């Protein structure tokens, strides 16, 4: 293995270029295995196909054709025209899962959305007083941090910021984190406190509002934009479309209940990461994991597939 796959769209670079840079003529007449079709256009790096052709590699196994319109079979065509044997499809289904965010972004222009929540056995994410630390275990939180690190962005609603004052960073034991995900705050009226803990952390924060709001210029790495819907709330579809153009390919949504409910109501959730504690909180005033309108009939409920523990 020359290198591992990239963890996000924001830091994706060419594995094929790495092969040529690190190995030079040592790879001549060898076989290359890649998960995604090599790119054939100029971006942050030169075309991957150019590096492969120049390296003298004789055969390339490609698991998945890149649905990105700039590639979409053209990379394979360039390699074959250069006399390189190309084999498509080995490991395709497994690889499509690994590349699910890139595939969705390329096909729809929208990021892949993972809804994450930690709840009690009766579906509560906080007590009636609003207390939520901690429902699940330290081990669960470490898994959550690893999932943050794999994401381009972390999204929460402003109520989560006001109640919990989260740092919204990826923190792993015994490992330096060189890139923090973009923090996305859904905040209709611009209520995020300027002394929020996250604003002093590494990385950038983006506040999506429903009206034009100006924050202090002294706050570093903070940007904002209005996405009003007809009800005076933040238009979540417009936010996701905007993020997709950055490009942000994956969004890890950590609540709260209102944001998760809105995303489910609009059919914007692609994956669910539920951490369930063997505990009961109870109470009609305790927050449930997913708010919103919800399913009126059982036939309207979300049914999850590919469930893993």
Regions found by a protein language model. Give the residues of each.
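Enzymes that bind and transform nitrogen-containing heteroaromatic metabolites
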Residues: 44, 112-309
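Zn2+-dependent cytidine deaminase-like catalytic core
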Residues: 14-95, 264
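Single conserved hydrophobic/aromatic residue that forms the stacking wall/gate
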Residues: 1-16, 20
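A short, flexible N-terminal coil/short beta segment enriched in small residues
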Residues: 17, 94-107, 187, 191-198
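Generic structural signal for well-ordered alpha-helical scaffold segments
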Residues: 21-24, 100-103, 145, 240-244
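Proteins enriched for Cys/Gly/acidic motifs involved in redox and nucleic-acid/cofactor modification
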Residues: 76, 90-118
């Amino acid at each position: 293995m020359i290198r591992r796959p990239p963890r996000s769209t924001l830091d994706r670079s060419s594995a094929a270029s790495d092969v040529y840079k690190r190995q030079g003529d040592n790879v001549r007449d060898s076989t290359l295995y890649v998960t995604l079709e090599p790119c054939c256009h100029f971006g942050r790096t030169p075309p991957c196909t150019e590096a492969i052709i120049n390296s003298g590699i004789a055969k390339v196994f490609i698991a998945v054709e890149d649905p990105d319109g700039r590639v979409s079979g053209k990379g394979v065509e360039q390699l074959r025209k250069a006399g390189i044997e190309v084999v498509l499809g080995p490991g395709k289904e497994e690889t499509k899962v690994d590349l699910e965010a890139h595939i969705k972004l390329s096909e729809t222009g929208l990021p892949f959305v993972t809804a994450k929540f930690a709840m009690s056995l009766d579906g509560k994410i906080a007590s009636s007083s609003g207390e939520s630390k901690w429902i699940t275990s330290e081990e669960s939180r470490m898994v959550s941090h690893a999932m943050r690190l794999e994401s381009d962005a972390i999204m929460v609603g402003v109520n989560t910021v006001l109640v919990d004052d989260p740092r919204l960073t990826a923190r792993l034991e015994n490992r330096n984190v060189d890139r923090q995900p973009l923090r996305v705050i859904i905040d209709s009226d611009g209520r995020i406190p300027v002394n929020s803990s996250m604003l002093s952390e590494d990385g950038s924060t983006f506040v999506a509002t429903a009206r034009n709001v100006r924050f202090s210029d002294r706050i570093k790495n903070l940007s904002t934009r209005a996405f009003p819907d007809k009800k005076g709330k933040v238009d979540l579809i417009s936010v996701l479309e905007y993020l997709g153009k950055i490009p942000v390919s994956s969004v890890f949504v950590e609540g709260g209940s209102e944001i998760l409910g809105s995303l489910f109501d609009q059919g914007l959730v692609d994956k669910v990461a539920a951490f369930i504690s063997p505990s009961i909180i109870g109470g009609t005033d305790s927050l449930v994991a997913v708010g919103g309108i919800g399913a009126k009939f059982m036939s309207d409920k979300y049914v999850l597939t590919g469930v893993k523990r």
